[in-house]
Amino acid sequence: LRDIANSSAYVGLMDAKEKLGVEVIYVEPADIAEMEEHQRAYADLGLDLVIVIGFIHQSALVEVSADYPHINFAIVDDVVDSPNVTSLVFEEHEGSFLVGVLAGLMSETNKVGFVGGMEVPLIRKFETGFAEGAKYANPDVEVLVNYAGSFGDPGRGRELAVSQNERGADIVYHAAGGTGSGVIDAAVANGFYAIGVDSDQDYMAPGTVLTSMVKRVDLAVYEVIKSVVDGTLEGGVRSFGIEDGGVGTSEFTHTKDMIPQSVLDAIEDAKAKIISGEIVVSNPLQ
C-alpha cells in the first residue's frame, strides 16, 4: 500500500478479520476520480460497513452516503454529518505537542522545523500542536514552517528540510505523507534529526529519527468494525487522543539511550497534563 494511513488501516482490517471473524475486502484507489466509484461499488454489494481513509474521500462520501441510507459508512480523518456515517478523527495536535516537547528540549540551536504536505486544516493541527509543545518546553525556541503542497513529493520534502537546516533547525518534524521520506533522507544526509509521523518511522533511519508521532488508524478501524459486530455502532463523531492511545510517541526503540531521562520524563509529564486537562492544546479546527 502506497500511503501510511492506508497501511495502518489495513493492519486494523486484518486484525478484525483474525479476531472478530469478519470477511473483508479492500481497494486502494489510484486517484481521486476513482473514489466515488469504489464507494458506490462497495455499497452496491450490501456490505455491513464501508470504511474510507482520508479527508480526500469526504466530498464523495457526502453524496454516496445520502444515496445509500441503508449502508453504514465510516470515514477516517474527516467528518460527514450523516446518520449512517461514523467519523473517526484523531487529536493530532495532542500527539504533536508531545513530539514538540521533545524537539524543544533536544534542540541545540533553539530552532526546529515543521514540514507539512498540503496546507489543509488537518495538517494545521500537527503544526499547531508541535509549535505549542516546543515553546511550552523551551520558550526560546523558534519554529520554522514550510508546506510542500503535496503528500507525494519526496524531492520537495528533502529540499524544504535542507533549507530549514541551513537556517538553523537541527530537528525537523514532518506531517507530509510520502513527501516526508525526503525529510528523513535529508536528515540522514545532512546530520540533523527528524521526527516521523502517523506510523513508527524510526526504522527508516535508526538514530536519526528521534521518534514518530504515531496515529493509530489501525485502532480506529478495528474499533468501528467491532462496534458493527457488537451491534453498538451509533454513527456520529468518534475521537481518538492521547488518553485512549489513539495518538502518541513511538517507543524510542533506536534513540532511548540518546535522549536524557529528564526529556523522557518531560514528555510523560506533558502527556499526563493533557489527559488531566491542565494543558489544553489548541485545535485550529475548533
Where are each of the predicted segments found?
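A residue-level marker of the well-folded mature domains of exported/periplasmic proteins
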Residues: L1-Q286
